[in-house]
Regions:
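Glycine-rich, acidic/polar active-site loops that bind/position phosphate-bearing ligands
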Residues: 1-402
Length: 402
């Protein structure tokens, strides 16, 4: 819920909050923040807090360097891992120009616009993520190593699964912040873990994904470990994915999911650079249940889009290519627009590819388009896309393609 200025100030006083983090993300999805004292709350909630945009790649230059953080009071949350005395709270922020207009390269604002555009068509989206990460040991100097915390396998239990207590601490911390995980387990790789989230409306789901990464990093440090979200931390081992579960419903009761899936399949090559943002992302494709071919099917985990065996409100499409280094605000916004394009254009869903791509012959696989094989190919696909040129500010497109 949105809190009034007086309610925020009262809460801060009652909870002995001494610092308020005003959080936002850069274009890559990395969280940034400015911390203010309670005395500055009134100014922050009325006028915003200025920051130097020229220091954030893609946000501006020295000539046009002033932007303002505008707190979203609905996102107020305590940070449970901070001290009980002199506590710390956080609010996510929108970004505005000095005249009060929204900053066009604010990915959170781009997602809000996508949600509003979908609502005008009578379509509501929801997203749930499946987040994978590795836990590595630290050396005697406290620096991260590539030594896995354990050597357990998929869904193993203690004592082989040493990450169980860490995952529990992560989930309980998230619950204290109002973020509700659905389940957690050990993944296939040594020291690899997964925590899944139920559906939320798009903005909340993206906020939760950013919060999750912060909590995992903080809990790992508290346990003398290092969390690694990179798409391919260890050669010869499974990579980290961020599977995105997508649900779309139409106000008129029509089943729009086939068109949404068709739209995403039609645009996935040009979207890939926003879902898989680093060179190592492309080392993950095609191995350990990570897709390479542009296809869909029911239940089949070798596909790009899988339709899980779920009914009713749990019916969804699972996009399996993204990884945890993506900007969730931008990723969700572009998936909404791809789905809406499928609905508007009446794009037909191609036949399901009921084959196992991990064991299929080259002759069979040659019938399907592939995701970009390298970051350079993904950048080229995005740069030449009329679809993206219509949707994204040039600064955002340049950041990802230059």
């Amino acid at each position: 819920m949105n809190y009034s200025k007086d309610e925020i100030k009262q809460y801060v006083a009652e909870e002995d909050i001494k610092f308020i983090r005003l959080a936002f993300c850069d274009l890559s999805g990395r969280q940034k923040n400015i911390s203010i004292l309670p005395d500055e709350l009134d100014r922050a909630l009325t006028y915003g807090i200025a920051f130097d945009a020229s220091a954030i790649p893609g946000f501006g230059d020295e000539v046009h360097s002033d932007l303002f953080l505008m707190p979203d009071t609905a996102t107020l949350s305590l940070l449970p891992w901070r001290p009980d005395r002199g506590r710390v709270a956080r609010m996510f922020c929108g970004i505005a120009r000095p005249d009060g207009t929204p900053f066009e390269a604010d990915a959170r604002q781009l997602l809000k616009k996508a949600v509003a555009d979908a609502a005008r068509l009578g379509v509501t989206f929801a997203f749930g993520t499946e987040m994978e990460f590795y836990l590595f040991r630290r050396d005697e100097s406290g620096e991260p190593t590539k030594i896995p915390y354990d050597h357990a396998g998929y869904m193993d239990i203690a004592p082989e699964d040493k990450g169980e207590n860490v995952r529990r601490e992560i989930c309980l911390t998230l619950e204290q912040m109002g973020v509700r995980p659905e389940c957690s387990h050990h993944e296939q790789g040594p020291g690899q873990n997964e925590i899944d989230f139920r559906y939320s409306e798009p903005l909340t789901a993206a906020d939760n994904a950013v919060t999750f990464r912060t909590v995992v990093d903080s809990v790992a440090v508290r346990n003398g470990l290092a969390a690694d979200f990179s798409p391919k931390p260890l050669s010869g081992q499974p990579g980290n994915g961020m599977h995105i579960n997508i649900s779309a419903k139409s106000a008129d009761g029509a089943d729009v999911m086939p068109r949404v899936i068709a739209g995403i399949l039609a645009h996935i090559r040009e979207l890939t650079v926003f879902l898989n943002t680093v060179d190592a992302s492309y080392l993950r494709f095609g191995g350990s249940k990570a897709p390479r071919y542009i296809s869909w099917s029911s239940e089949n985990r070798s596909q790009l889009i899988r339709i899980p065996a779920a009914q009713g409100e749990y019916r969804r499409a699972e996009l399996r290519s993204p990884d945890p280094l993506c900007n969730p605000y931008l990723a969700f916004a572009l998936l909404i627009y791809a789905g809406l394009d499928g609905i508007r254009s009446g794009t037909e869903l191609p036949p399901a590819a009921d084959i196992n791509f991990f064991s299929a012959t080259e002759q069979v696989k040659a019938q399907f388009q592939t995701l970009p094989a390298t970051l350079a190919q993904a950048k080229a696909a995005a740069e030449s896309s009329p679809f993206l040129a219509r949707l994204l500010p040039q600064a955002v497109l340049d950041y990802y393609t230059k």
